[in-house]
Amino acid sequence: MARLVSTALMRGLVRSSRAPRVAAVSQPAIQQFRNYSPGLGGDSRGSGDSSSTRVAADPDTHQDFQPTSKSSNMSFDDIVAQDIKENPVLIYMKGFPESPMCGFSALAVKVLKLYDVPISARDILGDLKLKECVKAHTNWPTFPQIFIKGEFVGGSDIILDMHQKGQLKDVLGDIAQKHEQKESS
């Protein structure tokens, strides 16, 4: 593959030195490269194929490897409402608490971990519909979005400010106590 691209580049450079027009790589070589390399054919997900793949259930295939349906009766609004209701500290963030994918999400997790509270999180990068639903629910355009005791608090800047002013300790105090009691039992 590298040889194909290299040869095409060299041919294009040689031609361009002879002709007044500039052409680095011939169109057929680019097309061959795109067909060979996944993710370069215009598919932003990196799969190289913009159409979905459907696999028919094969009776010879083990049940664990047969296709499954991902449909659910819950809407994204229901999922967000349930998340907020069931989790005392919830972050909608880029990545996960163990591996944040942006500095603001990392900062929010770092500040909340200072209080030894259980942190629940959802990665908004995994589902853009969920991301848009959360933004509509809070009317807040950026992430992370942090909920404490069912109330939207804000982003990492607000959590940091509350921490620096000593307000976060008051808000998270009873959650930390419940968490300690649960662990000691």
UniProtKB/Swiss-Prot annotation:
GO molecular function, one term: metal ion binding
List of residues binding [2Fe-2S] cluster: C102
Domain Glutaredoxin: from-to ranges: 77-179
Residue stretch of the organelle transit peptide: 1-36
Cellular location(s): Mitochondrion
Protein name (record): Monothiol glutaredoxin-S1, mitochondrial
GO cellular component: mitochondrial matrix
SUPFAM superfamilies: Thioredoxin-like
Keyword Membrane: no
Taxonomic lineage: Eukaryota, Viridiplantae, Streptophyta, Embryophyta, Tracheophyta
Binding annotation for glutathione: K94, K131, F143, S156, D157
InterPro entries associated with the record: Glutaredoxin, GRX_PICOT-like, Monothiol_GRX-rel, Thioredoxin-like_sf
Family: Belongs to the glutaredoxin family. CGFS subfamily.
Polar residues biased stretches: 64-73
Domain of life from the UniProt record: Eukaryota
Gene: GRXS1
Organism: Oryza sativa subsp. japonica (Rice)
Positions of the UniProt region annotated as Disordered: 34-73
Cross-referenced Pfam families: Glutaredoxin (PF00462)
Function: May only reduce GSH-thiol disulfides, but not protein disulfides.
Keyword terms of this UniProt record: 2Fe-2S, Iron, Iron-sulfur, Metal-binding, Mitochondrion, Redox-active center, Transit peptide
